[in-house]
Amino acid sequence: MDESNIRNFAIIAHIDHGKSTLADRLIEECNGLDKREMKDQVLDSMDIERERGITIKAQTVRLVYKAKDGQTYYLNLMDTPGHVDFSYEVSRSLAACEGSLLVVDSSQGVEAQTLANVYKAIDSDHEIIPVLNKIDLASSDPEKVKLQIEDMIGIDASESLLVSAKSGVGIQDVLEAIVSKLPSPCGKSDSPLKAILVDTWYDTYLGIVILLRIKDGVIKKGMKIVMMSNNAVYQVDNVGIFTPHKKIVDQLSVGEIGFITASIKELSDCKIGDTITEEQRRCDAPLPGFRTSHPVVFCSIFPNEAGEFDRLREALKKLQLNDASFTFEIEVSNALGYGFRCGFLGMLHLEVIQERLEREFNLDLTATAPGVIYKVTTKSGEIREVHNPHDFGETQDIANIKEPWICATIMVPDQYLGVIMSLCNNKRGEKLDLSYSGNTALLKYRLPLSEVVFDFYDRIKSLSKGYASLDWEMDEYLDSEIAKLSILINSEPVDALACIIHKSKVEQRGREICLRLKDLIPRQQYKIAIQAAIGGRIIARETISPYRKDVTAKLYGGDVTRRMKLLEKQKKGKKKLRSIGNVNVPHNAFIQALKIID
């Protein structure tokens, strides 16, 4: 295939600005699917993506377009996620392309994730075509949005394309702009194979499938390939493309994006960003890989049935293959049994993984309170990274604790600026900058990550009636007043309910958990003490009173000492029960208490 007729491009935008709908129209225009097969969000393959109206996994499709100049072009489209948790997917997609369609909702304007994604595209040396979507809405204001793009992003928006992806207006103009304005890929077909591994996933029938972009050379069935990071050798079984259906082809050459299967059994051999070359004719040096994405939010996941542990482990392995940023390791809890400590890119990422485990693998799960990574320095000088309360150690042995902070960019209409700033201040934030573009404020804050990952995104959406948008990136670790909150039931610590929290909020949280447990734990024949503690100091306590059996019911008249003797005997019996009895905490009580910790 002549690489001058290939165009590789990504669609980037803020969440809900119409990326996936635009992709649907491009596929429809190029006859990628017939009318019967077309459906909304055709590239969003997971049910959860369609239900939430979001893109989670970057998807690729090859379109064949007959342009007005009479030539046939092969367009490799990468649809990317818009939510901040999945920005790593965007980075990988951009590395496989030469250009980007920057989609902006013409009624909403530039939003925080728009800025973040377009800067990634600029860093990747992309040619960028601004596309103003939803022009059929009454609130659409294309001229205002063009000025906003030039003011905030600094690219020429005078020739922005005006489209309505929903109704199909302007789709032909988008396709013509792609072939005329975006560059074709560069490379040498006679050079040794050099391809970058863009993504992997597990297919029930094909095993591990690799999505790659060919930089130099060709790849074909039967060829022996090498993963340059670990020298693992495999023989290619199948070569194919997505149209968006899987289609087997003879080979992939320079500039093409497609998939291969090679009977790969080891997940560790498939590293995202790795360079693939030919065994007999290796390339000189590997391609620069992607920036490694590290988890920032951690929580423990336990099966509600002990016999489901192995099924959960296999399910996590399959999800990890499809999501390199997701990590897990075995964990044992006294209260919840065997499970896994899992790492995620954010709370939406956590919710999506948990929902996929429950839906796709039919697992019934309990998740503990999410947390972030703290850097703990002990008095002996040892520095440890801690994300599990169980590993926190004793308070008296700790010299210093640092917590991760982020730089948050919030775009909000000026009428909601006051409530958003109040929220940031309540979250221990530090204001860095405030600027305006028209009646939109661009607010920059430095915030503790632990305050952002839980409900911050939902809160700014709620306070601004849905108009505010958020993007953030890691900043640095700073000294902080952090404590481990332990929950004790009859003086026995419950590991599943422990959490790491800022000292300013620890008493309130401790009281809330104790009150919730008091309502949830059934009464016993003896008194139950529920306590919240920091180290050896009790900061909150609730008591569940015991059942009382009337041991004097059979007495009538007689000596009062007989009555006192029976009551004293009952008192001693309850004391003995309390010292040897384990409190039966219902599984539901853990789940409800964990919701408070969240």
Curated annotation (Swiss-Prot):
Domain of life: Bacteria
SUPFAM superfamilies, alphabetized: EF-G C-terminal domain-like, P-loop containing nucleoside triphosphate hydrolases
Membrane association type: Peripheral membrane protein
UniProt-listed Enzyme Commission number(s): 3.6.5.n1
Family: Belongs to the TRAFAC class translation factor GTPase superfamily. Classic translation factor GTPase family. LepA subfamily.
Job of this protein: Required for accurate and efficient protein synthesis under certain stress conditions. May act as a fidelity factor of the translation reaction, by catalyzing a one-codon backward translocation of tRNAs on improperly translocated ribosomes. Back-translocation proceeds from a post-translocation (POST) complex to a pre-translocation (PRE) complex, thus giving elongation factor G a second chance to translocate the tRNAs correctly. Binds to ribosomes in a GTP-dependent manner.
Protein name listed in UniProt: Elongation factor 4
Species name: Ehrlichia canis (strain Jake)
Taxonomic classification: Bacteria, Pseudomonadati, Pseudomonadota, Alphaproteobacteria, Rickettsiales
